[in-house]
Amino acid sequence: MTRPVRTRFAPSPTGFIHLGNIRSALYPWAFARKMKGTFVLRIEDTDVERSSKEAVDAILEGMEWLGLDFDEGPIYQMQRMDRYREVLAQMLEKGLAYPCYMSAEELDALRERQRAAGLKPRYDGTWRPEPGKVLPEPPPGVKPVLRFRNPLTGTVAWDDAVKGRVEISNEELDDLVIARPDGTPIYNFCVVVDDMDMGITHVIRGDDHVNNTPRQINILRALGGEPPVYAHLPTVLNEQGEKMSKRHGAMSVMAYRDAGYLPEAVVNYLARLGWSHGDAEIFSREQFVEWFDLEHLGKSPAQYDHNKLNWLNAHYIKEADNARLAALAKPFLAALAIDDAALAAGPALEAVIALMKDRATTVKEIAEGAAMFYRVPAPDADALAQHVSDAVRPALADLAAALKAADWTKEAISAALKATLAAHKLKMPQLAMPVRLLVAGTTHTPSIDAVLALFDRDVVVSRIEAALA
């Protein structure tokens, strides 16, 4: 009988989490949801010096923002130390592990000799018990590490869902340290115990873990477990072709939220960053879960493309509910010194959003465009001199008079503009540009009739007339 699917995301909380990291959560999440399975969040915090609560909070916040809900967890490795020590004791008792008293200095010297002889640097098994072998006397006062007794012959093989068949000779692997002298278990050991105890059936992770896999499989089999299905994802590269990392300028996941990206756009973009469903570029979260499979994971490194993300985000902004966008825009407006009182005194924010969103790539851009409706304009003096010339002033005066009498609708405003243009033999930019500057403070706006219709009539007329006084 096939076991129910159980996947996991197992980040180390040692820094911020970027798009390359969170992709290793998205795919196992999607696979678990597709297969009606269980998605486990495990925090691998055994690196006590580098781990932090702030990094854990960033992981949880990023997952919540993207909607990557987990069924079990977060499970912290540091809270499972008793279990690891229990398994270590069992391994010692069964001869699956042994104490090794070789010091770091001795190991370094051994490796130097091996390199000089043209050999691969590796532990030579000095303290490995064998039938008939006489072990050295343990040095006094030295606490040993524990090493896993790796098979000496045969191969470790697995059918990777991304890389295909992988085979590693056991002769290539030395006896891995699985516990430090103070008894603290090592990462590769903890991972195996966790995956076994948690019944993980599919491990979907970055291919920087490929070299760990044969060691983990050997430990797992020694403990009587069966390896999960492995899918090692190729690296995510930045736009310069380097591995995505904080050092190479990667943004944290939450920085995308703070820059005005929508979570559905980021999920859609991440989904395509190493997986495909035919030529589909835009799809909902529900479609992604329905379509996701391991067979269509990419085999080559995926390169981050900021313009592609912007294109997707612009699409989702156009599709988004105006009330939702208004709520998202408020913090950005507040950062522009536009408070609730200013918003209440101006046009309905949702109506402004409806006008501005088709021109925006991010919610931040929407807010920057919307700001003109809620502040007193301060047009550039050079722009005023260029556009509000003596030649256009009579047309501006006639337009102000026409707007006083017109119905306050986009259509009526458009008619007033066209009538003024015809009467003064002007082209639209000759009139629209100065009106934009005087009313909104900028020449960059959507259609002038739509913009004016959102302002209060008295505001529009008074701002035009003030420039003519």
Curated annotation (Swiss-Prot):
Disulfide bonds: none
Any one GO cellular component localisation term in the record: cytosol
InterPro entries attached to this UniProt entry: aa-tRNA-synth_I_cd-bd (IPR045462), aa-tRNA-synth_I_codon-bd_sub2 (IPR020751), aa-tRNA-synth_I_CS (IPR001412), aa_tRNA-synth_I_cd-bd_sf (IPR008925), Glu-tRNA-ligase_bac/mito (IPR004527), Glu/Gln-tRNA-synth (IPR000924), Glu/Gln-tRNA-synth_Ib_cat-dom (IPR020058), GluQ/Sye (IPR049940)
Span of the annotated motif 'HIGH' region: 11-21
Binding site for ATP: K246
Biological process according to GO: glutamyl-tRNA aminoacylation
Family: Belongs to the class-I aminoacyl-tRNA synthetase family. Glutamate--tRNA ligase type 1 subfamily.
Quaternary structure and interacting proteins, as annotated: Monomer.
Protein name: Glutamate--tRNA ligase
Encoding gene, per UniProt annotation: gltX
